[in-house]
Each structure stands twice: as C-alpha cells, then as structure tokens.
C-alpha cells in the first residue's frame, strides 16, 4: 500500500509518500508545495491564486506517486480566528485535490500523529523529524513540513495495521460464533 501524507498550510504544504508492506515502511518521496514567491509569482494577498497553486500541487503529487490512500492533518482552532479560517481553506483545497484523484482520505490530529510517531502527543517538531528519519532510515532530517506529512503517512500505516488486526479478530469471532451455533468447539 502506498500512503500520501499531507500537512496543509497556506504558505507551505508538506507532502510525504511511504510504501507499506506488512510492518515494513519504505520512504518514497517528500517535499513541500509553496504558494508564494518567485516560483509562483503570487503575492501573499492573492488567496484564490495560492489555493489554486496548492490544489494543482497536491493533484500533481497524487498523479506522480499514485498512492492508494491519503492522510491529512486536521487543523486546530488557532488563537487568531482569521488564521484558522485561512488554514481551513488551504486544507479544503488539498482535500478537494485528493478526493478529485479518487483517493480515500483519513484525517488525524497533530496530537495523534505525534503520539504514533514519537510516543507522546506533546513532542517538539525536532523530535518528529528525528523519529521520522529513524523510522524511514533517511540519511538526514526532513524539513518540518515534510516530516509532519511523512508522520501522517506513518500514523495511517499504523492505524491500518491496527484495523487489519481488529478485522482478523472480528473474523475469528464470527467463525467461533458460527462453530458454537453448529455445536462444534473452537
């Protein structure tokens, strides 16, 4: 399974792609999508243009790496309501690009991601970077946005493995129930 993690942001959106085979994680790619500056020619005030750059960037990453699923960070309510609204719009552009690519999308809070990757939800960005580097056996630290995106992909891989185990237990329980009803022991 190939998972695309997205850490949405209006100025910089991180992405990370991880392959999962059983319990093995393999790094595929990571990077950032920037919505301002020389590369885009857009100013900070051009919100619609920046959202289009973000949508197109996420669409391009999804087309290039062909993930089977995606994981996106759920935003928190910031002290500044305007910042929260702007981040929500960026997140909406990223989600729309993923859904447009027919990808199932899972959502995780930063706390859930940090707990899954580092072991506790109050981890610093540097701790997330270091654990992502170790888990994916990277030669160097990824940038903070890319590390968060890779962390989301890792979180989803762990959640998928846990759900598969729950499914196996449910299958076993159904089988045991059927055997019990048929009068056989299990």
UniProtKB/Swiss-Prot annotation:
Mg(2+) 2 binds at residue 73. It catalyses: Endonucleolytic cleavage at a junction such as a reciprocal single-stranded crossover between two homologous DNA duplexes (Holliday junction). Mg(2+) 1 binds at residues 7, 145. Its cofactor is Mg(2+). PROSITE patterns: RUVC. It comes from the Bacteria. Keywords: Cytoplasm, DNA damage, DNA recombination, DNA repair, DNA-binding, Endonuclease, Hydrolase, Magnesium, Metal-binding, Nuclease. It is an enzyme of class 3 (hydrolase). GO terms for molecular function: crossover junction DNA endonuclease activity; DNA binding; magnesium ion binding. One of its GO terms (cellular component) is cytoplasm. Belongs to the RuvC family. The RuvA-RuvB-RuvC complex processes Holliday junction (HJ) DNA during genetic recombination and DNA repair. Endonuclease that resolves HJ intermediates. Cleaves cruciform DNA by making single-stranded nicks across the HJ at symmetrical positions within the homologous arms, yielding a 5'-phosphate and a 3'-hydroxyl group; requires a central core of homology in the junction. The consensus cleavage sequence is 5'-(A/T)TT(C/G)-3'. Cleavage occurs on the 3'-side of the TT dinucleotide at the point of strand exchange. Homodimer which binds Holliday junction (HJ) DNA. The HJ becomes 2-fold symmetrical on binding to RuvC with unstacked arms; it has a different conformation from HJ DNA in complex with RuvA. In the full resolvosome a probable DNA-RuvA(4)-RuvB(12)-RuvC(2) complex forms which resolves the HJ. This is Crossover junction endodeoxyribonuclease RuvC. It comes from Acidovorax ebreus (strain TPSY) (Diaphorobacter sp. (strain TPSY)).
